Amino acid sequence: AASDVYKRQLWDGLDDPYLYTVTARLDNGETETTRFGCRKFEIDPQKGFILNGHPYPLRGVSRHQDRKGAGVAITKEMMEEDMALILEMGANTIRLAHYQHAQYFYDLCDKYGLVAWAEIPYITEHMPEATANTLSQMEELVLQNYNHPSIICWGLSNEITVTTGVTENLTANHRLLNDLCHRLDSTRPTTMAHAFMLDPNDPFVQLPDICSCLLYTSPSPRD
């Protein structure tokens, strides 16, 4: 079934993270309810991130889903504390590193208007025998989180060339992931995070829609 939303109110980041609620009901009486937001965005090389037609500079953090004494078994209250701290520091975007996070936290991103980067746990080292696993995890990530307006990109991997470098098999695996994302979701771009400087003309670097480079720098004294 399909339906148009007329005179829709946009999900507009921190300024107005407006959400709609939709319920699907089957003939047997079963129902499923979800929330979604209406928004459009683009990424321009000169203007940066544009949300609903206006520039929206991104300032953010990366979040791991764990706590001392709790590990990854964190509570909703802990997630809410994380969100409160992120908002208090003035961030408007978040990278959910480097795996599927709890649905409750994606919901919080929608609710409070954080722009989010979601990704799979394909990290540091490429293993050829794990290709099927990476594809399965990416499919689950996209299908489970498609309705979240906060998510604006799918991350293919993180610092994947640290131990293995760029290989033909590595590139092929990322091409499969990239194609899968585009097939499942034509509305969001793909990206990957690089830890080291790579040739910008390398086909591997140019493979996703967005190239993201991590800069690790030590604090330096200032006058």
Model-based region annotation:
Residues 1-108, 112-116, 137, 147, ...:
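Secreted/periplasmic carbohydrate-active enzymes, especially glycoside hydrolases
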Residues 127-129, 157-180:
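Active-site cleft segment of glycoside hydrolase catalytic domains centered on the general acid/base Glu
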Residues 124-136:
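Active-site-adjacent "subsite" loops/lids of carbohydrate-active enzymes
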Residues 120-125, 215-218:
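Short, acidic/turn-prone active-site loops that include or flank metal/cofactor-
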Residues 140-167:
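Active-site groove signature of glycoside hydrolases
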Residues 103, 126, 161-163, 198-200:
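Generic structural signal for helix capping and beta-alpha/helix-loop junctions
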Residues 172-218, 222:
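Extracellular glycoside hydrolase catalytic/binding regions
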Residues 63, 99, 121-123, 157-159, ...:
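Active-site beta-loop-alpha junctions enriched in small/polar residues
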